Amino acid sequence: MPAAAGDGLLGEPAAPGGDGGAEDTTRPAAACEGSFLPAWVSGVSRERLRDFQHHKRVGNYLIGSRKLGEGSFAKVREGLHVLTGEKVAIKVIDKKRAKKDTYVTKNLRREGQIQQMIRHPNITQLLDILETENSYYLVMELCPGGNLMHKIYEKKRLDEAEARRYIRQLISAVEHLHRAGVVHRDLKIENLLLDEDNNIKLIDFGLSNCAGILGYSDPFSTQCGSPAYAAPELLARKKYGPKIDVWSIGVNMYAMLTGTLPFTVEPFSLRALYQKMVDKAMNPLPTQLSTGAVNFLRSLLEPDPVKRPNIQQALANRWLNENYTGKVPCNVTYPNRISLEDLSPSVVLHMTEKLGYKNSDVINTVLSNRACHILAIYFLLNKKLERYLSGKSDIQDSICYKTQLYQIEKCRATKEPYEASLDTWTRDFEFHAVQDKKPKEQEKRGDFLHRPFSKKLDKNLPSHKQPSPSLITQLQSTKALLKDRKASKSGFPDKDSFVCRNLFRKTSDSNCVASSSMEFIPVPPPRTPRIVKKLEPHQPGPGSASILPKEEPLLLDMVRSFESVDREDHIELLSPSHHYRILSSPVSLARRNSSERTLSQGLLSGSTSPLQTPLHSTLVSFAHEEKNSPPKEEGVCSPPPVPSNGLLQPLGSPNCVKSRGRFPMMGIGQMLRKRHQSLQPSSERSLDASMSPLQPTAPSSLSFDMADGVKGQC
């Protein structure tokens, strides 16, 4: 049985400054006996759980009182995972509101499919999905750096070098999406977050307010939300492709460099805004910008999609890669699945041995990137371990952590009683023997390698009687026996030698395996789960001794992997002539055969077909409650009181007056619902007329099945 919530709690705080401050990782915590992770990583302090302000608990998560964002149907709150003590972001979706709008339920399903299919360092990771009687919960990794829009508000504008770094990361993430056949369609400053390392994290893949993009009506009566970031062909209700994201990247780049939007009209009119985009009547740029930055920005904001560069061409731009020390981004490919060699053996062993999960369940869940509680525990523990090791340059990532810190004893113990008493008996004898053999000139040189005591200790030694010769012989033999036993056990040189002293000094400086009695503890090799081939049975010879047969290696049940394909093979799929259609499944059929592969081909000996194991669907399904069933109350405590005055509104919130002019917070879907009742459908041909009809989703059974993700075409 998996460990219950609250197991592994520590009596003391996990680390100072755990609420977001600088953590003290210079001195590693001692590992518990038989543990595969240090106590700071595997344990959670009770004070951290008690001090976290929350009003509800759902599963293994505490729903915090701090609100990170809010939309028309969802609220994003800060949460705490009780098994790891790590903070997460939880998107809470109201069931009663969502089930009234099929658009929301469809995009909710789409967001889960896309985020389980995509894996990129600049895209947020979906960890878990939960469902209660009244709400859906999407658990994602927390970005403590906040929103990029807040940073622009504080600095007024970003300098060119910082904006180039953010734009490079954004283009890399969008290029990865386009490679998988996904068009984001709602790239704006509000959807760009910053992690603890000041890197871009892209969010919002399904619940973005883009209903007006589909061409249902013309609801725009205010210059708010997505219209300011939409491409001209999108506003004109023409067929569009992945280049609409390139235009949105240009608008974001302009906002970073200037602090305003590139195209604005007063009073607002959608037709006037479109005409200004077509005429290239961009607002003036700062004079301190370089020529390369201006040329790249104008190329992104090209109104003609044929002349506008695609995402691969934008990623290879000279200005974007100027002064870039790393590998060229256009030559980097990120796999959508973790390989078996990249799994953290320490975390896997901890989850199987300490938390009680099956080894095959942990490996299959992580390799398939299926959002559930197992993936959340692995991701949070691995992230916590990486943060713990970040300040230690002498520890390599390829070495299992068990071989370095698992065997550290909790406290410094005294010497063994027998050895301590032996040193007391032989102290006077060794002192007199050394004084008789060595001349006084050698004592002045301070040859401490052959003298067990310092001068101060020699002067303060009490006088004892000379021991008998029989006792001296017995003590010498016993001392030699102890040294031989230690050397045979550890396999290291004598502790009194110079080599051993240097080796122990290096080991103790890095806080590696060492005991108080100067013995080096033998460390067995870690049990890393890996795929190996079956060994042929060994036939012993007639004269050789019988050898026990080795145990057969564990054959792990693998799942299919959607790896990124080569860039040259599929660039034509993203050509301007190819127009994407908005369907519930984001993966192209043309990419299916070229991107699927099995992880363990060596397991199928004699088989011509690859390993076919169906992908696991999400354990939690979205089933709508019946109208006749009475609602059940959730155990919700009253949240802490909120100040009545409006002086503490965060910058960039919908209620802040300063946030309404430059970076509006409303989306297209919100404005649609405000004016959808009064406006008539446009006479122009809608986008749906030129597309195949969307497949209706049955409201009674709505699940995140990754197998559906490869059937459709975006």
From Swiss-Prot:
Keywords: ATP-binding, Kinase, Nucleotide-binding, Serine/threonine-protein kinase, Transferase. Gene3D superfamilies: Transferase(Phosphotransferase) domain 1 (1.10.510.10). InterPro entries: Hunk, Kinase-like_dom_sf, Prot_kinase_dom, Protein_kinase_ATP_BS, Ser/Thr_kinase_AS. Residues 1-16 have a biased composition (Low complexity). It comes from the Eukaryota. SMART domains: S_TKc (SM00220). ATP binds at L68, G69, E70, G71, S72, F73, A74, K75, V76, K91. It catalyses: L-seryl-[protein] + ATP = O-phospho-L-seryl-[protein] + ADP + H(+); L-threonyl-[protein] + ATP = O-phospho-L-threonyl-[protein] + ADP + H(+). It is an enzyme of class 2 (transferase). Its EC number is 2.7.11.1. The active site is at D186. GO terms for molecular function: ATP binding; protein kinase activity; protein serine kinase activity; protein serine/threonine kinase activity. Residues 62-320 form the Protein kinase domain. Residues 1-28, 624-658, 674-714 are annotated as: Disordered. SUPFAM superfamilies: Protein kinase-like (PK-like). Belongs to the protein kinase superfamily. CAMK Ser/Thr protein kinase family. SNF1 subfamily. This is Hormonally up-regulated neu tumor-associated kinase. It comes from Mus musculus (Mouse). The gene is Hunk.
